[in-house]
């Protein structure tokens, strides 16, 4: 997907760069939420810097993105460039878009999402760390998902603390959530939504079920949905004899995810690395009890046994204990789910949009003021 016109208006004019909107994942969800919130005072044009397909198709899309960016900066009345970035190839692609934007004298807001950026950055050769840090410091403002990520970027990349804003991801808050009771069709439905692979602990989750007593496993139904290594996970489920307990789905639509969220009692995400996962926020908004891990921005949101249960990444015995606790304790499930929903009410779309537009306005103002000061010298 190339250039996408969202709103035409007379207020702030923003170029947003990020993954194509037809891709899957949390970054795309964040972009769509922002674009849906754009109002009469903000015009947002979206440029896709990454699309699905072969390496040739991806390269062609990125070159087109650079052309669209340059053309808009040259011909359009652009006030600010908002760049979504993660790790690995994304970090280098968006380094080019940052440099082009600054070459045209435009303020840049870099919006970071990479759950493994710290590992990626720390394993780069020293020269590339220096170059990447230099480019990132060219950005006028940084948006991170949690205080822990702010500390990392300030310390590792030597960003100015006052230029780094913490803005947790937004989430749509359902008006009402169902009364969940004691499970669905005699079983307690647990769900996992996200990329299926080791980083999000999908294989650990399946293996942990072997540690459950048979009576608890008989009451459990686990549905896992996502892209990635779904076939490998199906093989593991069959190998462990858990076909009657675990259902593996490929990536499902938002409507299917909503339907499952209404039926489910518990959301599980035993990740090794995260930013602040959209799937977690969405599950909490539906009032699901949550089992997850204290990684990335999660411990800033989840307090153990207050609005969720935290287990250590990779500890399948601890994970099984948490699962067993919530299978057997309906009251605790209800209390944790209610507290989880209350915790994400401040993350609603209206509050998020106000915070984001405040960042836009202050960044544009600071950039304009700095240019005037430099001109008057």
PLM region spans:
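Conserved acidic donor-binding segment of nucleotide-sugar-dependent glycosyltransferases
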Residues: 304-305, 309-316, 325-330, 345
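Donor nucleotide-sugar binding/catalytic pocket of nucleotide-sugar-dependent glycosyltransferases
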Residues: 131-176
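Nucleotide-activated donor-binding/catalytic signature segment of Leloir-type glycosyltransferases, i.e.
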Residues: 234-252
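Conserved donor-binding/catalytic core segment of Leloir-type glycosyltransferases
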Residues: 15-17, 182-209, 223
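Short hydrophobic beta-strand element within catalytic cores of glycosyltransferases
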Residues: 289-292
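Glycosyltransferase donor-sugar binding loop
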Residues: 48-52, 193, 220-234, 250-251
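Aromatic "clamp/platform" in nucleotide-sugar-dependent glycosyltransferases that forms part
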Residues: 272
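Short alpha-helical donor nucleotide-sugar binding micro-motif in glycosyltransferases
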Residues: 251-252, 259-264
């Amino acid at each position: 997907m190339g250039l996408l016109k969202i709103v035409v208006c007379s207020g702030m004019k923003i170029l947003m760069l990020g993954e194509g909107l037809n891709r899957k994942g949390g970054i795309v969800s964040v972009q769509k939420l922002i674009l849906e919130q754009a109002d009469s005072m903000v015009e947002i044009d979206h440029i896709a810097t990454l699309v699905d397909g072969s390496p040739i198709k991806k390269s062609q899309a990125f070159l087109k993105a650079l052309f669209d960016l340059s053309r808009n900066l040259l011909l359009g009345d652009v006030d600010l460039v908002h760049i979504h970035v993660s790790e690995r190839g994304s970090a280098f692609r968006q380094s080019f878009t940052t440099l082009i934007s600054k070459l045209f004298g435009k303020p840049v807001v870099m919006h970071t999402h990479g759950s493994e950026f710290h590992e990626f950055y720390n394993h780069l050769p020293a020269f590339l760390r220096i170059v990447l840090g230099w480019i990132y410091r060219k950005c006028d403002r940084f948006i991170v998902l949690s205080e822990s990520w702010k500390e990392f970027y300030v310390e590792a990349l030597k960003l100015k603390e006052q230029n780094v804003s913490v803005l947790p991801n937004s989430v749509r808050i359902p008006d009402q959530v169902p009364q969940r009771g004691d499970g669905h069709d005699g079983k307690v439905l647990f769900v996992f939504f996200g990329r299926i692979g080791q980083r999000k602990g999908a294989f650990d989750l399946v293996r942990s079920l072997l540690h459950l007593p048979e009576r608890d496993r008989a009451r459990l139904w686990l549905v896992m949905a996502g892209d990635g290594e779904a076939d490998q996970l199906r093989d593991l489920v069959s190998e462990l004899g858990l076909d009657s307990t675990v259902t593996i789905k490929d990536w499902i639509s938002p409507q299917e995810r909503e339907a499952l969220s209404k039926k489910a009692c518990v959301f599980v995400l035993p990740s090794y690395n995260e930013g602040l996962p959209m799937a977690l926020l969405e599950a909490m908004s539906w009032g699901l009890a949550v089992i997850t891990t204290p990684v990335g921005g999660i411990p800033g949101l989840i307090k153990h046994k207050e609005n969720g249960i935290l287990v250590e990444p990779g500890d399948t015995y601890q994970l099984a204990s948490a699962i067993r606790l919530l299978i057997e304790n309906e009251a605790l499930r209800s209390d944790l789910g209610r507290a989880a929903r209350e915790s994400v009410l401040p993350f609603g779309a209206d509050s998020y949009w106000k915070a984001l537009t405040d960042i836009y306005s202050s960044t544009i103002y600071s950039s304009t003021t700095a240019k005037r000061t430099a001109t008057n010298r």
